[in-house]
Amino acid sequence: MATFPCQLCGKTFLTLEKFTIHNYSHSRERPYKCVQPDCGKAFVSRYKLMRHMATHSPQKSHQCAHCEKTFNRKDHLKNHLQTHDPNKMAFGCEECGKKYNTMLGYKRHLALHAASSGDLTCGVCALELGSTEVLLDHLKAHAEEKPPSGTKEKKHQCDHCERCFYTRKDVRRHLVVHTGCKDFLCQFCAQRFGRKDHLTRHTKKTHSQELMKESLQTGDLLSTFHTISPSFQLKAAALPPFPLGASAQNGLASSLPAEVHSLTLSPPEQAAQPMQPLPESLASLHPSVSPGSPPPPLPNHKYNTTSTSYSPLASLPLKADTKGFCNISLFEDLPLQEPQSPQKLNPGFDLAKGNAGKVNLPKELPADAVNLTIPASLDLSPLLGFWQLPPPATQNTFGNSTLALGPGESLPHRLSCLGQQQQEPPLAMGTVSLGQLPLPPIPHVFSAGTGSAILPHFHHAFR
């Protein structure tokens, strides 16, 4: 790769343009002059001329946050901020007492004192120069020396100026400085910029109040936050998942917003139809069962009701006390089975007002209550064999009367007599009395004697 060394100072440059600009520092030539009538400054490169033209602009977009002083250029503001730095290192001149914030400014100031006394030697490299201006430019070159090898080097140099960049992309972005193409216009001050990031930075720092006022008028406040501070973002937090049907007793229903309370869940299309509410009479007897709750599952039957042997018992209620078949007075202590209404009971019965769940039996028994016609040809010993009855006694009370069956008398005749002698009413389950129950035939195998009616054990049927 061809290099261009300087014959005067020994510096080497990679491009011809950089070498030419460097030669201007030796020849004191300034080809780029300011066009302002009152300014006669000239510069060695186009870039430095354009940077100087910003000082003639009435718009000072760079403002100090400490003293509100404004500047045309950003580097001027940066140099000014060092005056407000409490940790700054001040370089004071021993001859005149003037202080500088940078080493370069301090050395240049010392070079002026040395040049006034006739000494044009560089204090850094001990190079002797011809004039004071050359000495100042030489001191500036020392400040622009290459950084240490540990840092990243700027290898990509601009073809139009002496600036170097880390990547070629930075070089292409820098080219707008040389082309002068400014396609980005500020909507507040009509200032134009060659790069979009420069316009964004200018808008945030200079017209932040105008942006806020415009956003308040249009109602678009969210876009203002993104424009002013891209790192600040508004994030909408979703509500935590919460069951809509939560009870108010847990103290969480009050914390839900009003929109959640107003939500209603529509049932699915294939959902089952809701259960019919219970009657008021059953709901009063069972307050724990809500009207909308499904009924509890029914218990399985102990016996197969489809069998022909037990088909007459299919319409009867489930298992009750077997001893009550022989003594009707035992049913006085049994609870009722959820009557739908007290008016549906048999007229011969009425609920006791003092004791809920008991039946007051009338003193007079209807004559047709136990007038049953039971054929004596059917054998119900398999059905009655599982009953455990007390041993035979000489006298057994059936209600308040005594029933005596002889060996030669038939059961229907004795049951008819029982209806005339019995003073206690028959058992009623719901609205069905004992005379209306479809009881199966009862065998007439009874032991002889003058005692009460004794139902036999299973082995008595084979005697």
Curated annotation (Swiss-Prot):
Question: Where in or outside the cell?
Answer: Nucleus
- Keywords from the UniProt entry: Activator, Diabetes mellitus, DNA-binding, Metal-binding, Nucleus, Repeat, Transcription, Transcription regulation, Zinc, Zinc-finger
Q: Where is this region: Disordered?
A: 268-306
MF term (GO), any: zinc ion binding
Q: Which InterPro entries match?
A: Znf_C2H2_sf, Znf_C2H2_type
Q: Name one GO biological process term.
A: negative regulation of transcription by RNA polymerase II
In terms of Gene3D superfamilies, this protein maps to:
Classic Zinc Finger
Q: Spell out the GO cellular component terms annotated for this protein, sorted alphabetically and separated by semicolons.
A: Golgi apparatus; intracellular membrane-bounded organelle; nuclear body; nucleoplasm
ZnF (C2H2-type) ranges:
4-26, 32-56, 62-84, 91-113, 120-142, 156-178, 184-207
Q: What does this protein do?
A: Acts as a transcriptional activator. Involved in the transcriptional regulation of type 1 receptor for pituitary adenylate cyclase-activating polypeptide.
Q: PANTHER family under this entry? A: ZINC FINGER AND BTB DOMAIN-CONTAINING (PTHR24399), ZINC FINGER PROTEIN PLAGL1 (PTHR24399:SF31)
Q: Which family does it belong to?
A: Belongs to the krueppel C2H2-type zinc-finger protein family.
Assembly notes: Interacts with THRSP.
Q: Which disease is it linked to?
A: Diabetes mellitus, transient neonatal, 1: An autosomal dominant form of diabetes mellitus defined by the onset of mild-to-severe hyperglycemia within the first month of life. In about half of the neonates, diabetes is transient and resolves at a median age of 3 months, whereas the rest have a permanent form of diabetes.
State the protein's name. Answer: Zinc finger protein PLAGL1
Gene of origin? PLAGL1
